[in-house]
Amino acid sequence: MTAPDVRPRWPQGREGCMALAFDLDGPTGDAMLNGTIWQKPEYFTFGGYGPFRALGRLLDMLEQYDVPATFFIPAWVVEQWPRQCAAIVEKGHEVAYHGYRHESFYTLSGDQQRQVMEKSRKIFWQHLGIRAGGFRTPSGDWHPETPGVLLEAGVTYSSSMRGDDRPYAISVPGYQQPLVEIPGKWEMDDYASLAYTREPDFPKGLDRSASYALTLDNWCREFDGAMDEGLCLTTLFHPKISGKPGRILLLEQFLAHMKQRDVWFARCQEVADWYLQEQQHD
């Protein structure tokens, strides 16, 4: 007996979906939340390099290869670098929520999460004129109340969990429309292979950067495996990590490899909208 085909029916009959995504964290995160970053100018500039210097390089690359992307941005970064963040929208890419200062949502109560989302919504509207429809949880996990908080804030999709290789629905009591999840995987996080800081030790235990050639090979294998099965792949790349001169060449090679296949390159919001439409038809 043949197993049922679980491949999604991608637009235009494409063989798979690639939702390229970047987390424009800047210097936000644990060191900012606990205050130690203000005693570590080097670490602050390590993060600030992302929106200040690397972002423009990435936008030029995406334009060259004609690939859309989604940028998940802590609202504090939008406040500090509004012109750079506005350039993302002007270039036709998507911007989405990523906390205010990259808070760990699994440590916050429902009310605290609502405060973060409301602040983020106001800042995105004030500086970008955008009501974002997407969210990626900082820290890679969330509180049981988070899906409801997101729907309450007008969010239609998340790219936070790891439960599938395809978009799926998260039903929330009291809401007719589910929250769409576009799952990622740590293998497609550039921190896992390319991040390095001496102090603070982050990621902990990582004492050197991986070979660029091996990193590219890993990414290409993950992409090819996903496309061979007709799945959806997204990335957790960071401009401050991958947007440096030597590493942008790595990303260019990855984009060139992906462009060889007949896949749907989509913003995450487009993937979520497609999923909701397909779900209505099934």
Residue ranges with predicted function:
Residues 181-206:
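Glycine-rich, positively charged active-site loop/lid region within alpha/beta enzyme cores that binds
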Residues 132, 198-211, 239-240:
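Surface-exposed cleft-lining segments at the edges of enzyme active sites
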Residues 1-134, 139-187, 213-235, 243-282:
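Catalytic alpha-helical scaffold of carbohydrate-active enzymes acting on polysaccharides/glycoconjugates
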